[in-house]
Amino acid sequence: MNKSYKNTGTLIRVFFGQDYDLFGETVEEILDSYLETENPKTAAKVCQEAEYLLLLNDQVLTETFESISQGEFYPEPWGETVRTFLEKIKSHLSARL
């Protein structure tokens, strides 16, 4: 992975990790909690990183996401694929910045 996705990684590992329920029960609630605590510039960087990730083919995207999340989050139990999860993050955050 030659591009840094540190802001997205932090969002995923901290807000969607094992203690996700501290921040909400749905993806949208958790993202709203993220926006309440995070600098808007950092949230905008997450949107930009998600945009770059979404340009990847599905195999590379999945491999890169696994590296970013460090095994602490999988979107499938949330009814999402990696791609739909990142699209949801980008859409939700962008609409609120």
Task: Specify the residue positions occupied by each region the protein language model found.
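Amphipathic alpha-helical interaction modules
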Residues: Y20-Q59
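Amphipathic alpha-helical binding modules
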Residues: E66-L97
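Short terminal alpha-helical segments
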Residues: M1-D32, K90
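A short alpha-helix capping/helix-loop junction motif
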Residues: V27, T62-I68
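Short, charged/polar micro-motifs that form catalytic or ligand-binding hotspots
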Residues: N2, G17, S33-P40, E72-G79
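Alpha-helix boundary/N-cap detector
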Residues: K3, L22, K41, K45, ...
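Surface-exposed polar/charged interaction patches
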Residues: F15-Q18, T37, L53-L56, G71, ...
